[in-house]
Amino acid sequence: MQEILVLGAGKIGALITGLLADSGDYRVQLADKEEGAADDVVKAHGHGNLDAFMFDASDAASLTAHIRANNPVAVISGLPYYCNVAVAKVVREENLHYFDLTEDVAVTEEVRKLAEGAKTVFVPQCGLAPGFISIAANELIQHFDELKSVKLRVGALPQHPNNVLKYSLTWSTDGVINEYGNLCQSIVDGTEVDVLPLEGLEQIEIDGKLYEAFNTSGGLGSLGNTYGERVTTMNYKTIRYPGHCEQIRLLMNGLKLNHDRSTLKRILENAVPQTLQDVVIIYAAVTGFQDGELREENYVNKVYPELVSDRLWSAIQITTAAGICSVMDLVLSNPSNYSGFIAQEEFGLIDILENRFGEYYAHGGTNLTSAEAVARGATGHQR
């Protein structure tokens, strides 16, 4: 049984911990800096393969001391993006495998530099977007002789929106603000460029329902680096219900809260409720030439909340945790096949979907799951 250190007992870390422990192949060390946070998750899971610890993982000395005392083979960071470089530095020094969920471009570049020459693996951006969307798009790309455009679209939305933003906080508020406020990598006319967030507003119709999509930061991952010389257009946009972008523009641009993110975070967390009743929409479209003909292929999927260990977990929790667990599982099953920096697109879509963790993407659940769970009181407390 391999020892895994999971940093952060929040929304995603709690499910990562449960999935890995339930597999029977991993013993999980869950750490959080807040008193009782890791203990509460471990008690809620009630699993013998879990241990709780309290320390500040952003402090190099504390993290190093824990690693040397408890000997994990890999570290999963479920911490806010701004903590990950410090964690990755310690992991590099201790010769462990590293996985994170960051969407931040600058953090990923720092991790890439740290991974140079490493015999262990460094795999950032292991969540949904970036993460699974890159894997799905890469599979489509392989079907074409010549590429023209690659469009990545992902959204985590409340199933039943009833506020002016038509949105609920389903994951990290810091992460949402970061995506909405930072420059966005794109390829336009064959050239890598940075475009403004909250721009490029478009309508998109999926299963007969109308959504909007607009530029946000980080979701392109490393696909631009991998295929930049082969594609004319490549971009990533976040999917929301119509009208959301206009409201966020008012907050971030009109009221200048992009320059006062702590205030924006406080406003959002005081006004926008959390929910476990969400839906994740994944949409990738690739256009190019096959056998001399211009064609398009799509990957479209909706993932709903699911019951894990008799408790309801949101779709964004399911997709994010399944993404990083499946990638780590593939690496640790064949560690000799990997070393250094590993981009998400180096993993095969079918390998992810057939993995015991990645299979959550394959069946996706239904929109009835959360309704039934609420009706019989199975939503529960996750920690």
Where do the model's predicted regions map?
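Rossmann-fold cofactor-recognition segment
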Residues: 45-59
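C-terminal catalytic/substrate-binding lobe primarily of soluble NAD(P)-dependent oxidoreductases
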Residues: 143-383
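Helix N-cap at the beta1-alpha1 junction of Rossmann-like dinucleotide-binding domains, i.e.
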Residues: 34-37
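Rossmann-fold NAD(P)-binding glycine/threonine-rich loop
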Residues: 101-124
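Conserved Rossmann-fold cofactor-binding substructure of NAD(P)-dependent oxidoreductases
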Residues: 57-70
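Hydrophobic/small residue at the entry helix of a nucleotide-binding pocket
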Residues: 12
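N-terminal glycine-rich "phosphate-gripper" loop used for MgATP/nucleotide binding
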Residues: 56, 72-85, 95, 101-106
